[in-house]
Design a protein with these regions (language model features):
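Sec-dependent bacterial lipoprotein signal peptides
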Residues: 1-36
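Mature, structured domains of secreted/extracytosolic soluble proteins
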Residues: 15, 32, 36-563
Length: 563
């Protein structure tokens, strides 16, 4: 059996949304539709006169369907076709399905059964048997041109003379439990984006990762009921629906009623990048499930940036800016331009140097896969993000020593020249508890990666940002030292003083670089652990006329270092 898909190179890339996707919204309306013309009434009435026997009995009695009948029997689907559930069966004739191919399908089915493959994943059931059967009756007339849902969830176009582009030979053979059609061809099976990654030998690393989180949930509405025994319905065909928690985050690339593009790295690129990304998610030994967290987070860091919802991107073709499913509507920016990124957002994706350059395009049932032998999405565009930690937010204040507690919060009013030059126009004022001490405050820095070089800035604010009449003493610069505390691999806290004593500039918003390309041995991403940053005033008693012991801090910028 052949799996059909279309491949184009980047230069000749084109998209043709076939009728399978275009007509998806009409599927439900098709089921159980009633007559609307005299011709249709006559046709349906004629079919009704033949309603004797089951679909399975009709298959057995038709000498032109022997090979399809053998495959159905070998896969135990004769029980389904002789049951009470109403079905439409589109059976390929022996001219369309030869004896050798039928034998091959039976052998493949039996091999997968022996290997413990679930029926939901059995390729013969999913891609062949269920691809030729639909729930409910779907009689055709001269007016027919609709899309129906097959038992595998695929949408297939049914016209008066074709199904999935293959010619109908006999139509509307009404039986006691449905309808039989004979087809001069096999209905093409088009994989969706998720399925294709498992069928392409160069992409199966992506599939193997995603499929680890597959769960199947029983769906009674799609299952074929049998007898009721001891008050419980026994199902001839139990249909389960794929439920993967990762899809709720990155996009439902497995759904036929959705449209997605996926930039998928080949196995060689996958291996190269996951080897690198694993180093960014090393958790200390105190973190539960640290190995599984490292595995999942490093691979989600790779997969998450390359999936795109067609509806959110104006059809994608010709678009200037492409947003992945993880893109945020907000971008993190600052007045000093330390941070100015739109994460998971890519400019000119089809242009030279764009993320789709050099990729292969594969058109699928619910979108496209762009196969990337050179994965062009940078970690700095996705998970290696700059962040701002506000000193004014109490959840990031760890300990306060020799200072008034709680810290005083100051707001920059709209008439002040510093308005909108400070994140959220609010900052913390750290006032010594008496004139003879140097205050210190330790702040929490969340969600940092291991072995990722960071540039760390402290943003100091002048007194005139909230009081334009501040005295000369209040406007003095600050002098301070700083420490970082983090866990080593064994979960033991390690404290390190940052090099030097820092001084701020007066009467300006001063972003002081505390550390450049600083790397932590452990990761705190998605945990309750924090890196801790202590800011401690360092003004001697003889220096109080030159420096202020009161420190005003808006917060801290943590930016991945770029060489």
């Amino acid at each position: 059996m052949r799996i059909c898909c279309r491949i184009y190179n980047n230069k000749t890339m084109r998209i043709q949304y076939n009728n399978i996707i275009k007509a998806a919204a009409a599927v439900i309306a098709v089921a159980g539709s009633t007559a609307c013309s005299d011709t249709w009434d006559d046709h349906y009435a004629a079919a009704d006169n033949t309603a004797n026997g089951t679909v399975w009995e009709a298959l057995q009695a038709d000498n032109s369907l022997t090979n399809f009948t053998r495959v159905v029997k070998a896969c135990n689907y004769d029980l389904v076709l002789s049951g009470s559930q109403t079905l439409s069966v589109f059976a390929p004739t022996d001219n369309a399905l030869g004896q050798a191919e039928a034998d091959e399908l039976i052998s493949q089915y039996e091999t997968e059964k022996r290997n413990g493959v679930k029926d939901d994943d059995n390729k013969v059931l999913k891609q062949f048997i269920k691809n030729h059967i639909s729930l409910y009756t779907h009689p055709v007339s001269s007016l027919s041109d609709d899309s129906i849902t097959m038992m595998n969830g695929k949408y297939t176009v049914l016209t008066s003379s074709t199904i999935g582009g293959k010619a109908l030979k006999q139509t509307n053979q009404l039986k006691s439990n449905g309808m039989l059609f004979t087809v001069e061809g096999q209905i093409p099976y088009y994989p969706n984006v998720y399925e294709y990654t498992g069928q392409d030998s160069e992409l199966d690393s992506v599939y193997n990762f995603l499929s680890k989180y597959n769960e199947y949930v029983f769906d009674a509405s799609q299952s074929v009921p049998g007898n009721i025994i001891d008050g419980k319905t026994h199902y001839l065909d139990s249909v389960t629906v794929l439920n993967n928690p990762l899809f709720s985050t990155i996009g439902f690339i497995n759904r036929e009623d959705s449209a997605y593009w996926m930039l998928a790295p080949t196995n060689s690129e996958w291996n190269r990048l996951t080897k690198e990304y694993d180093n960014y998610f090393i958790y200390d030994k105190s973190v539960s499930n640290r190995d599984s967290m490292q595995y999942t987070n490093s691979r989600m860091a790779l997969v998450g940036g390359g999936i795109f919802n067609v509806n959110d991107n104006q059809g994608i073709l010709g678009i200037d800016t492409l947003y992945s499913t993880l893109a945020s509507p907000r971008s993190l920016k600052s007045y000093i331009d330390i941070i100015d990124y739109n994460y998971y957002t890519y400019a000119n994706p089809f242009a030279a140097g764009g993320i789709f350059e050099g990729t292969e395009d594969i058109e699928l049932s619910n979108g496209h896969v762009r196969k990337a032998h050179d994965y062009r999405i940078s970690k700095y565009q996705t998970f290696a993000q700059s962040s701002f930690v506000s000193a004014a937010m109490t959840q990031y204040q760890d300990t306060i020593l020799n200072a008034e507690d709680p810290l005083t919060l100051r707001t920059v009013v709209s008439t002040n020249p510093f308005y909108n030059k400070i994140n959220s126009n609010v900052f913390a004022e750290i006032v010594p508890e008496n004139s003879g001490v140097n205050p210190q405050v330790t702040f929490k820095l969340p969600n940092l990666l291991s072995n990722m070089g960071y540039d760390i800035y402290a943003v100091f604010v002048p007194a005139i940002a909230y009081d334009t009449y501040a005295t000369d003493e209040q406007r003095l610069p600050c002098r301070f030292i700083s420490y970082l505390t983090y866990n080593d691999l064994n979960g033991k806290p390690v404290t390190s003083r940052l090099t030097g004593t820092f001084e701020t500039q007066p009467d300006v918003v001063d972003s002081v670089l505390l550390a450049s390309n600083y790397k932590f041995p452990t990761c705190t991403y998605n945990t309750d652990n924090y890196v801790k940053l202590r800011i401690q005033s360092a003004v001697g008693n003889s220096q109080t006329s030159k420096y202020s012991r009161t420190m005003r801090i808006a917060g801290f910028y943590i930016r991945p270092h770029k060489q």
